[in-house]
Swiss-Prot record:
Modified residues (Phosphoserine): S248
Annotated InterPro entries: Ntn_hydrolases_N, Proteasome_alpha, Proteasome_alpha-type, Proteasome_asu_N, Proteasome_sua/b
Organism: Drosophila melanogaster (Fruit fly)
Family: Belongs to the peptidase T1A family.
Cell location: Cytoplasm; Nucleus
Region feature (Disordered): 230-253
Biased composition (Basic and acidic residues): 231-253
Keyword Nucleus listed: yes
Superkingdom of source: Eukaryota
Keywords on record: Cytoplasm, Nucleus, Phosphoprotein, Proteasome
Name under which the protein is recorded: Proteasome subunit alpha type-3
Keyword Phosphoprotein assigned: yes
């Protein structure tokens, strides 16, 4: 712990002399240690992809999932602490259910993002609680609004994106996503997500990982699907092929 944080990092309600809230900085560090999570908007779909690090071969395959279905057309992926992710996913589902009960329709993603971001921000204001060690990516698609993608940071700030990333390889993933077209078809979207996750995975530090994917769009009938078998396998094959091509290029040079 740096000396500048001494005495100013015990509470989320206290600023340091240089205007920082160290508890939020520490929450961001928890996100940076997590496996990489990305979201990409296409022409008529949004894909969420996760590099789920396997810390033990004794876990069941679906243990510690980082992708959630919030509403039938809304998906959520998280980087950071899995337990925090489960908690916030339940909060988001409750917000969606309350909206549907009151207005008899699905909650707009922008409204859900605003509500969840406000909840996350509230946990940065009081000394009795700690900020969530979590970065949240929300995705949806419908006939009226089309594809939508938002990200919420541990501070509670939120923005809309064409593509975004969180986790340990965030910067490398962003560099790869900046090369993409912004109006990709669903099959291109899925393959690009697989290629990026496999490319940013660091085999020296984290040997085993499981690729997981969430997809919502016209091809899914407006439903958010987690690990749709055919498309997920397509993404994994594209990622594996891209990884092998990169390895062969490195050997050549």
């Amino acid at each position: 712990m740096s000396t500048i944080g001494t005495g100013y990092d015990l509470s989320a309600s206290q600023f340091s002399p240089d205007g920082r809230v160290f508890q939020i900085d520490y929450a961001s560090k928890a996100v940076e240690k997590s496996g990489t999570v990305i979201g990409i908007r296409g022409k008529d779909a949004v894909v969420l992809a996760v590099e789920k690090i396997i810390t033990s071969k004794l876990y069941e395959p679906d243990a510690g999932g980082r992708i959630f279905t919030i509403e039938k057309n809304i998906g959520m992926a998280v980087a950071g602490l899995v337990a925090d992710g489960n908690f916030v996913a339940d909060i988001a589902r409750q917000e969606a259910a309350n909206y549907r009960q009151q207005f008899e329709q699905a909650i707009p993603l922008k409204h859900l993002c605003h509500r969840v971001a406000g909840y996350v921000h509230a946990y940065t204001l009081y000394s009795a609680v700690r900020p969530f060690g979590l970065s949240i990516i929300l995705a949806s698609w419908d006939e009226v609004e089309g594809p939508q993608l938002y990200k919420i940071e541990p501070s509670g700030s939120s923005f809309g994106y064409f593509a975004c990333a969180s986790g340990k390889a965030k910067q490398l993933a962003k560099t790869e996503m900046e090369k993409l077209k912004m109006d990709m078809r669903t099959d291109e979207l899925v393959e690009s997500a697989g290629e990026i996750i496999y490319k940013v995975h660091d085999e020296l530090k984290d040997k085993d990982f499981r690729f997981e994917m969430g997809l919502v769009g016209r091809v899914t009938g407006g439903l958010h699907l987690i690990n749709p078998s055919e498309l997920t396998e397509k993404a994994r094959k594209a990622g594996d092929a891209a990884n092998k091509d990169e390895d062969s290029d490195n050997e050549t040079h």
